From Swiss-Prot:
<feature type="binding site">
    <location>
        <begin position="220"/>
        <end position="223"/>
    </location>
    <ligand>
        <name>S-adenosyl-L-methionine</name>
    </ligand>
</feature>
<dbReference type="Pfam" id="PF21239">
    <property type="entry name" value="RLMM_N"/>
</dbReference>
<dbReference type="Pfam" id="PF01728">
    <property type="entry name" value="FtsJ"/>
</dbReference>
<feature type="binding site">
    <location>
        <position position="239"/>
    </location>
    <ligand>
        <name>S-adenosyl-L-methionine</name>
    </ligand>
</feature>
<keyword id="KW-0489">Methyltransferase</keyword>
<dbReference type="InterPro" id="IPR002877">
    <property type="entry name" value="RNA_MeTrfase_FtsJ_dom"/>
</dbReference>
<keyword id="KW-0949">S-adenosyl-L-methionine</keyword>
<feature type="binding site">
    <location>
        <position position="276"/>
    </location>
    <ligand>
        <name>S-adenosyl-L-methionine</name>
    </ligand>
</feature>
<dbReference type="Pfam" id="PF18125">
    <property type="entry name" value="RlmM_FDX"/>
</dbReference>
<keyword id="KW-0698">rRNA processing</keyword>
<feature type="binding site">
    <location>
        <position position="187"/>
    </location>
    <ligand>
        <name>S-adenosyl-L-methionine</name>
    </ligand>
</feature>
<feature type="binding site">
    <location>
        <position position="259"/>
    </location>
    <ligand>
        <name>S-adenosyl-L-methionine</name>
    </ligand>
</feature>
<dbReference type="InterPro" id="IPR040739">
    <property type="entry name" value="RlmM_FDX"/>
</dbReference>
<dbReference type="InterPro" id="IPR029063">
    <property type="entry name" value="SAM-dependent_MTases_sf"/>
</dbReference>
<dbReference type="GO" id="GO:0005737">
    <property type="term" value="C:cytoplasm"/>
</dbReference>
<keyword id="KW-0808">Transferase</keyword>
<dbReference type="GO" id="GO:0008757">
    <property type="term" value="F:S-adenosylmethionine-dependent methyltransferase activity"/>
</dbReference>
Amino acid sequence: MKNLFLYCRAGYEKDCAAEIQQRAAELGIGGFVKANRDDAYVVFQGFSPDDGDRLAKELPLDSLIFARQMFACGDLLDDFSPEDRVTPIAESLTEVERAGELRVETPDTNEAKELSAFCRKFTVPLRQALKKRGVLLDKESSRRPIVHVCFVAPNKAFTGYSLSNNSSPHFMGIPRLKFPADAPSRSTLKLDEAFIHFIPREEHETRLRSGLNAVDLGACPGGWTYQLVRRGMMVHAIDNGPMNHDLMETGQVTHHRADGFKFEPARRNIYWLVCDMVEKPARVAELMEYWAIQGWFKEAIFNLKLPMKSRYKEVSQILANMHAILKENGIHEFHLACKHLYHDRDEVTVHLWLRPSSPWI
């Protein structure tokens, strides 16, 4: 397949397009992007017949900032009748063999969501047809490719596949998280999603374990602190504003009425540093760099608020600067990742893990 379909947040198509254009070029893959504002998806159209296949295999989804999910695809199917959508869709997927799962999806827009009920019903006959053709296995398998059918309109769809080891495990790339009734603010879901996205599930018991020490810069009223507390951590909450009473009653939170940009930890026993302050992204990045150089944490998750224009360019520059500054200051082993998460709005979430191979004392 020559194209690559990418889901993103509505309004961020231009940023997603700029990113995939650059990343494809880095792999020596030429093409152009089709994107319309508020469609919540973009399509990279390659010049060679297998460009989409190459990107689906060689470009790590986790390395993309603005794409929630991606799959190799053909051209838009828009010539089938409402009476028989199954046949043309099944015929478009003949290149896919022995896939382990079928996902009939829509972009994340209010208009497209109106097709959700249809997609659920349509999945049953389509699954049966794909099994008969050998496109799908009789039983689901998490190790085989995933078939994607994305309806962008009632009679228009993109079809293709993603590889199970380079694909979001979530439908449409969106994790379904429930807002805790006792959480101080909805921002709590941002950190919850960040932990799910950046930390492999099998490592939660070590890297997110009870008893770790954490610092939350700009903590008020405690949305992010809540996620640390519910995992059993001891938290230093830094903010001049008031903290949620119930959080303080847990005995796990020490509230420091101080400026998050001026606070310094008394001891070097902080594992997690988190920060969701409303501030210029470059200034927050500089603060994180300073903490890293001082050796004041092991892992950090922080948000960068985005400008109105040139968002991909701005974030890319900040990440490149951070990478260079850490190296210049003797930190040669680290993992730096960035994602525009579902619960983020005009911001991105960054994860920084210092010296991953060195044990935490």
